[in-house]
């Protein structure tokens, strides 16, 4: 099963006319990809920071959408995960989720990060293009979600810790039990 992981572009400069040219891959996505790979899933990473830094700085949102569509066509994933580290990236994350759904209406979209962790119910209530929200650390959550989708078993969603979703009737369900990863040291 294939999972496309997306890190949105983050301009860390106050002066938006100044752009960094030394972005590194998203550590969060690398951790998620490692967990997926260790559990026999096929992750593909799209770090839009690197895509934007090297081209189309002035029209980044449209360029990012183009990169996402190309990645969907190339990867043909079963699940798309989008990192939303900062609240400032949330509007773009919603645009990217909408881009995914416009391209592939049945594609499942999960988001995670600090902003979604703080507002899972509000996001699922107001954002029809987001299907799932990882709450807190997402490494175990993404693996459990991928397994549920692979098995085509929605009942498994209720067992995923630190996770929010809409059930088959559209009701929002939030599993608040904490899901900590093992110490990395």
Regions found by a protein language model. Give the residues of each.
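Short glycine-rich His-centered loop
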Residues: 3-23
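Short catalytic helix/loop segments, enriched in acidic residues and glycine
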Residues: 21-36
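Hydrophobic beta-strand segments of well-ordered beta-sheets in folded domains
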Residues: 1-4, 79
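Short secondary-structure boundary micro-motifs
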Residues: 18-19, 28, 148-150
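Radical SAM [4Fe-4S] cluster-binding motif and immediate context
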Residues: 24, 184-185
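Glycine-rich beta-alpha loop elements in corrinoid/cobalamin-binding modules
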Residues: 35, 39, 44-183
């Amino acid at each position: 099963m294939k999972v496309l992981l997306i890190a949105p572009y983050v301009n860390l400069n106050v002066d938006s006319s100044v752009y960094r040219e030394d972005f590194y891959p998203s550590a969060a996505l690398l951790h998620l990809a490692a967990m997926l790979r260790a559990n026999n899933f096929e992750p593909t990473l799209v770090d839009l920071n690197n895509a934007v830094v090297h081209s189309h700085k002035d029209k980044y949102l449209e360029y990012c959408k183009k990169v996402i569509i190309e990645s969907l066509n190339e990867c043909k994933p079963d699940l798309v995960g989008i990192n939303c580290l900062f609240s400032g990236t949330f509007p773009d994350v919603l645009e990217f989720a909408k881009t995914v759904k416009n391209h592939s209406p049945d594609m499942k979209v999960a988001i995670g990060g600090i902003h979604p962790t703080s507002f899972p119910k509000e996001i699922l209530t107001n954002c029809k293009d987001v299907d799932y929200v990882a709450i807190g650390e997402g490494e175990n959550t993404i693996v459990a979600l991928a397994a549920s989708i692979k098995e085509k078993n929605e009942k498994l969603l209720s067992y995923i810790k630190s996770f929010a979703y809409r059930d088959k009737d559209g009701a929002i369900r939030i599993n608040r039990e904490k899901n900590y990863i093992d110490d990395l040291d």
